[in-house]
Every structure is written in structure tokens, then in C-alpha cells.
């Protein structure tokens, strides 16, 4: 609202002065409230282009701005134009945030996109671990934010159910199943799955089938009967997906679509691409089909079809992205682990070859997570004996805490979470601190009567901390829309935490209920706006805005 108003005023002034309108300039809260509520560096940006004094340009722009739209407009060195909000501006901001079910202003229809965001997508051969949790939270929250600004978003899980790994997992499970039945004539191959996951699925097999498969034959590390092999491989995949879905739901993540790599392969989409869009970019060598990815900047060409005529993961992934494009998605976002960095260039190149516009294939890379207790890393799962699983994680920290601490830093940074800190009930724990602010205001509003807007006098919100909080309230829509473009979700958490700090400072130093009615009503209006904003922003992150603590 306020950002749009300031930008409209500046852009109009630039046109009136015949100054360039294609410049990228900033509008932001002032660091020192004495200089104004918001400022712009437009004069400094233009001074470099026009080779003029920024003070002279700023003066010209200010003369073209409508002074009636703001309390006042000033200049400060080296070239900032400062805007002081009018009481009417503040009232508009605070009144909008009186609505409990508040939502941000949507993008114009022509800017709204259909977006597919694929995340987690772990192989159905093991349980999810900490790295997957951060990936899941990033995808889930990005989806919430993109939907909030008006995009149509589909959350998708790409099931890697094709190839040798799922077959090996099924073989491992069958051998464990036989062992559970007391049949020990088969040993696990060295390259199979020796963890506890096959045992979990084997126990499910006994519940579902009893001893039905006790006579199954295995030769050369393969189930002899191909029909039974296919049935049990699918069974094992489905069981692991069931466990994965359960774990995701336990942390508040629910996918819209689950897409099978096997189904994509069986659709012959990759063959169609090889015969059409990719035909001028492939060649055969050593019995395999290669895509000339070096033309797109890759360090070497990549195999799409192996010598045994089976597709590589890269090949089916190309087909998968093409099918998403055909389904009508304008933007394809992938949340990957940082170890997939090398896949970006070649996948983006293939996406362009198949008709996906440049810039519409997007990758967010997630770094790893470590849990610390007593300053020591928690490395092993009680349940699995290896990586920390989701049930393990939830024994150490709550869903709300895990969401906050996995999202409050840039996704390019590795995270070390001190589980002792996450369980503290004081200001050192940011989750508690923010939730406490919400609960504090809820209690305050419960004690107060309804807010009478006729008795509100916004000129009474004149302390630095009050003006700063109003400015945060006026800024947050801009932050949400910005994150929908940059995907830097951590900046929204930092925003709500900083707002909360200001609130606690204000609450501790300003009396609210025991005041003259005009002051009380005005401060209650501000407090309720802050409460509703905290509630809204926490909802985007899937964190509960508690009312009692």
C-alpha cells in the first residue's frame, strides 16, 4: 500500500521531469526514524546515470511530488528523499489489519502464474531425515507465500520408483521377510539395503500376507518369478511412500500431486522428445544415447538412454519437466539438496530445448541441518541407527520450533540447531518470543472493551517505537511480495521477529489499559493490528499463533 503509493508518486515525477523511468531504485524504512518513515535512493541512482548532483535531482523530484499525500517530504544527504506518513495513511494500514482473516493484496491477474513446486522427492527406499525436513519446510512455505500473492500453486513429489535401487530395496525386504519367518537360506547382497527400513516393510508384509511368499525363489540376487517380483517391488515402494506421507503429515506437509517416474517412462514421453525437440541435440555412442549438454555450458555430455536401452534418471527428469510444462505450468520450481548443484545447468539446458522458457525453470538449493544437544551433534537415530528421522527430530523439538529454526537462515547456509535453546521459555528462544507476543496481545484484548474507531487519534502514536511499528505494519506486504520473487523466506521470519522485539519494548514501557480513553483506544488499535499480522505471518510458515502460554 504505502510502497505502491510512494513508487507511483516517484514514477509520475520522473515522467514530468523527462528523467529515465527504467531505473531500479529502492524504497525502504528509514534506519533513523528522525529522518522520516520511508526513504528512496532514486536521486542517487539517477545521479550516476545523468552525471548530476543527487541533491539537485532530489530537489527537482520533491517539487513534483504531491505534498498533500504525506505529512511531509524532505531531503537528507547524500541523496535520500524521505517520506513522513500522514495520519490518514497510518489509519488505512491499521484498519486493514483489524480483520482477523487478513490477506495480502494479490498480484494483478496478468501477473498471476500457475506454478509447480517440486520438493522432498526422496527415493522410496528409506525414511526421511533432517535434510529432507528442511527441504519440505522450504517447499511448503514457499507454496504458501506464492499462493498468498495470487499464484496458483501445485506441490508435487517426484517418486523415483524406476531402476535398480527400488529393485534392490524390494529384494532386501523379501530376504528380511523370509528371515522374520525363520527362513535363513538367503543372505543380503553387499550392495543391498542393510538398514532397518527393509525390516519395517518386512513386518508389514507379514501382517498383510502372512507366510504367502515363504516359498519364493531367489537366484543371482533376483526374484525368479518376474510377475511376483514386480508385484512385491510395487508393494515395497507403496509401503515406503505410506511411511513418507505419514512423516510429512506429522510436520504439517501435504503434497497435492505424487508423480511416478515409472509412469512417466511408460508414457513414452522421453521417446517423443528424442524424436522431436531433442533430435538435433543427441548422438549415439557406445550403444548409449547422449545429449550434447556441452552446448549449454556443461563440462561433458550426458547419457539419456543407457546401453541396456533403459533411461537414466536425467532422461526421465527431462520428460518429467516437459510434462509439467504441457500440464500448463508457467514456472517450475525445484527444491533440491545442495549436493545436486551440478545438475542445475544441464537440467535447465534440457528444459529450454523442450520448450520451457529461460528463467521459468528454477532451483532452490538447500544446505544440510545438524541438531546439537549440550554442544554436541546428535548423529544417530534411536529408531533407525543412522540418520535422524522425523519421529526422532520431534522428540527433541516441536513442529513449530523445527519450522522456525530450519527457515530463519538463508537456504545457502548450513544450519546447526541447539535443541536446548528451542525448548527455552524466554526471550532467547525466538519462537517462544514471537508466540508470547501474540498471546500477550490476545490477553490484553480480552481485558479491553471493543475498539472505538471514533476515539482513535493517530497523532498520539508519536514515540519512535510506535512510529517504527506502524512502519513495519505498512511494509510487510512489500516483504511478502518480495519473498515471492526471491524465495528468501528467512527474511520474513526476521521481519516478524524484529516487529516482535519492538512490540515487547513498547508493551513494557507504555501503559495501555489504564490511560485516557483516546490513548487507550489508539494503542489498542495498534496492538490488535500487530497481533493479526503476527498471526498471518506465522500462518504462512505453518507455525501456531498461540493465545495462551
From Swiss-Prot:
Q: What InterPro entries does the record point to?
A: aa-tRNA-synth_I_CS, Arg-tRNA-ligase, Arg-tRNA-synth_N, Arg-tRNA-synth_N_sf, ArgRS_core, DALR_anticod-bd, Rossmann-like_a/b/a_fold, tRNAsynth_Ia_anticodon-bd
- Which HAMAP family does the record cross-reference, listed alphabetically? Arg_tRNA_synth
**Gene name for this UniProt entry:** argS
Localization in the cell: Cytoplasm
The record's listing under PROSITE patterns reads: AA_TRNA_LIGASE_I
- Which coarse location class describes where this protein primarily resides? cytoplasm
Q: What is its EC number?
A: 6.1.1.19
Example GO BP: arginyl-tRNA aminoacylation
Any one GO CC term of this protein is: cytoplasm
Question: Of which family is this protein a member?
Answer: Belongs to the class-I aminoacyl-tRNA synthetase family.
Which ranges belong to the motif 'HIGH' region?
122-132
Keywords (alphabetical) are: Aminoacyl-tRNA synthetase, ATP-binding, Cytoplasm, Ligase, Nucleotide-binding, Protein biosynthesis
The domain of life for this entry's organism is Bacteria
- The protein depicted here goes by the name Arginine--tRNA ligase
- Specify the enzyme's EC class, one word: ligase
Amino acid at each position: 500500500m504505502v510502497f505502491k503509493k510512494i513508487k507511483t508518486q516517484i514514477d509520475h515525477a520522473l515522467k514530468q521531469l523527462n528523467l529515465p523511468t527504467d531505473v531500479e531504485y529502492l524504497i525502504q524504512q528509514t534506519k533513523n526514524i528522525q529522518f522520516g518513515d520511508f526513504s528512496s535512493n532514486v536521486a542517487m541512482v539517477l545521479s550516476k546515470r545523468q552525471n548530476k548532483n543527487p541533491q539537485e535531482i532530489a530537489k527537482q523530484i520533491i517539487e513534483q511530488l504531491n505534498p498533500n499525500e504525506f505529512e511531509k517530504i524532505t531531503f537528507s544527504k547524500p541523496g535520500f528523499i524521505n517520506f513522513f506518513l500522514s495520519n490518514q495513511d497510518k489509519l488505512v494500514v491499521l484498519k486493514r489489519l483489524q480483520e482477523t482473516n487478513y490477506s495480502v493484496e494479490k498480484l494483478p491477474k496478468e501477473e498471476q502464474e500457475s506454478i509447480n513446486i517440486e520438493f522432498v522427492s526422496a527415493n522410496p527406499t528409506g525414511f526421511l531425515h533432517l535434510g529432507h525436513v528442511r527441504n519440505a519446510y522450504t517447499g511448503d512455505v514457499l507454496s504458501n507465500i506464492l499462493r498468498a500473492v495470487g499464484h496458483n500453486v501445485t506441490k508435487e513429489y517426484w517418486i523415483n520408483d524406476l531402476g535398480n535401487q527400488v529393485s534392490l530395496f524390494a529384494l532386501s525386504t523379501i530376504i528380511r521377510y523370509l528371515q522374520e519367518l525363520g527362513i535363513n537360506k538367503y543372505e543380503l547382497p553387499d550392495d543391498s539395503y542393510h538398514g532397518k527400513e527393509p525390516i519395517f516393510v518386512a513386518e508389514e508384509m507379514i501382517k498383510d500376507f502372512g507366510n504367502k511368499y515363504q516359498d519364493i525363489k531367489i537366484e543371482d540376487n533376483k526374484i525368479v518369478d518376474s510377475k511376483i517380483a514386480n508385484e512385491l517391488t510395487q508393494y515395497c515402494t507403496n509401503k515406503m511412500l505410506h511411511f513418507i506421507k505419514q512423516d510429512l503429515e506429522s510436520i504439517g506437509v501435504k503434497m497435492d500431486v505424487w508423480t511416478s517416474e515409472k509412469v512417466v517412462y511408460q508414457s513414452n514421453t522421453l521417446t517423443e522428445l528424442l524424436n522431436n525437440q531433442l533430435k538435433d541435440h543427441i548422438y549415439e555412442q557406445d550403444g548409449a544415447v547422449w545429449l550434447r549438454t556441452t552446448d549449454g555450458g556443461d563440462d561433458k555430455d550426458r547419457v539419456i538412454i543407457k546401453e541396456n536401452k533403459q533411461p537414466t534418471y536425467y532422461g526421465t527428469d527431462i520428460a518429467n519437466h516437459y510434462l509439467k510444462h504441457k500440464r500448463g505450468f508457467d514456472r517450475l520450481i525445484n527444491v533440491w539438496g545442495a549436493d545436486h548443484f551440478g545438475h542445475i545447468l544441464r537440467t535447465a539446458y534440457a528444459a529450454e530445448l523442450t520448450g520451457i522458457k529461460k528463467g521459468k525453470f528454477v532451483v532452490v538449493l538447500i544446505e544440510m541441518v545438524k541438531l546439537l544437544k549440550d554442544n554436541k551433534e546428535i548423529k544417530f537415530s534411536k529408531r533407525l541407527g543412522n540418520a535422524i528421522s522425523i519421529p526422532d527430530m520431534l522428540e527433541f523439538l516441536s513442529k513449530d520450533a523445527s519450522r522456525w529454526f530450519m527457515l530463519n537462515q538463508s537456504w545457502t547456509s548450513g544450519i546447526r540447531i541447539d535443541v536446548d535453546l528451542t525448548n527455552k521459555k524466554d526471550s532467547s528462544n525466538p519462537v517462544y518470543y514471537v508466540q508470547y507476543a501474540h498471546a500477550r496481545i490476545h490477553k490484553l484484548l480480552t481485558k479491553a472493551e471493543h475498539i472505538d474507531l471514533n476515539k482513535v487519534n493517530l497523532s498520539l502514536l508519536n514515540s519512535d517505537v510506535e512510529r517504527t511499528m506502524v512502519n513495519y505494519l505498512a511494509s510487510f506486504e512489500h516483504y511478502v511480495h518480495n519473498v515471492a520473487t526471491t524465495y528468501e523466506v528467512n527474511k520474513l521470519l526476521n521481519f516478524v521477529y524484529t516487529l516482535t522485539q519492538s512490540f515487547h519494548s513498547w508493551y513494557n514501557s507504555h501503559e495501555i489499559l489504564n490511560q485516557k480513553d483516546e490513548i487507550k483506544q489508539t494503542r489498542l488499535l495498534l496492538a490488535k493490528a500487530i497481533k493479526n499480522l503476527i498471526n498471518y505471518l506465522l500462518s504462512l510458515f505453518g507455525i501456531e499463533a498461540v493465545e495462551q502460554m
